[in-house]
């Protein structure tokens, strides 16, 4: 199990107890600094004070459990307009929206695709309408995905 998935399982109960959805979390390096980025949301959106409240709750859990070796910075925020997509339910929620995905392994010589989410089946296969074709990808083959903000309507 990846460290991000372990962290997700560890902090989800604390986030949900406050009435928020834990959209996802990512652990990465920015220069010499390790960052734990946590995305939370609720219907109607989430504000700065709520992010601070969630941050304090997550910090308390992480201080007790100590799952990350060494120093790191905790960042808690809303997922934003170009929100990350992690689960089949995230894709289902945003059917009809544009997304960009990066695959773990290349397909037809490329790893990155942009298209409209048109379906997610029961086997968790995501279907994207690309410019000139349909792309069907099992969720497990997607390394990273985000919505694309559409300001043109």
UniProtKB/Swiss-Prot annotation:
Gene3D superfamilies: Ribosome maturation factor RimP, C-terminal domain, RimP-like superfamily, N-terminal
SUPFAM superfamilies linked to this entry: YhbC-like, C-terminal domain, YhbC-like, N-terminal domain
Protein keywords: Cytoplasm, Ribosome biogenesis
Coiled-coil region list: none
UniProt keyword annotation of DNA damage present: no
Gene Ontology cellular-component annotations: cytosol
Gene Ontology biological process terms, A to Z: ribosomal small subunit assembly; translation
Segments traversing the membrane: none
Chief location: cytoplasm
Pfam families linked to this entry: DUF150_C, RimP_N
InterPro entries, sorted: Ribosome_maturation_RimP (IPR003728), RimP_C (IPR028998), RimP_C_sf (IPR036847), RimP_N (IPR028989), RimP_N_sf (IPR035956)
Subcellular location: Cytoplasm
Family label: Belongs to the RimP family.
Role played: Required for maturation of 30S ribosomal subunits.
NCBIfam families reported in the protein's UniProt record: PRK00092.1-1
Protein name: Ribosome maturation factor RimP
Originating organism: Coxiella burnetii (strain Dugway 5J108-111)
Lineage: Bacteria, Pseudomonadati, Pseudomonadota, Gammaproteobacteria, Legionellales
Gene: rimP
């Amino acid at each position: 199990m990846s460290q991000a998935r372990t962290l997700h399982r560890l902090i989800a109960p604390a986030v949900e107890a406050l009435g928020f959805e834990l959209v996802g979390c990512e652990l990465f390096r920015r220069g010499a600094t390790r960052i734990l980025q946590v995305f939370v949301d609720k219907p109607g959106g989430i504000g700065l004070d709520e992010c601070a409240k969630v941050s304090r709750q997550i910090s308390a859990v992480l201080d007790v459990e100590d799952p990350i070796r060494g120093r790191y910075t905790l960042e808690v925020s809303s997922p934003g307009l170009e929100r990350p997509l992690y689960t089949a339910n995230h894709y289902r929620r945003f059917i009809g929206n544009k997304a960009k995905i990066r695959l773990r392994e290349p397909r037809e010589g490329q790893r990155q695709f942009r298209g409209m989410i048109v379906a997610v089946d029961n086997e968790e296969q995501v279907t994207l309408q690309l410019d000139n074709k349909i792309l069907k990808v099992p969720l497990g083959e997607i390394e990273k995905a985000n919505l694309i903000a559409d300001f043109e309507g």
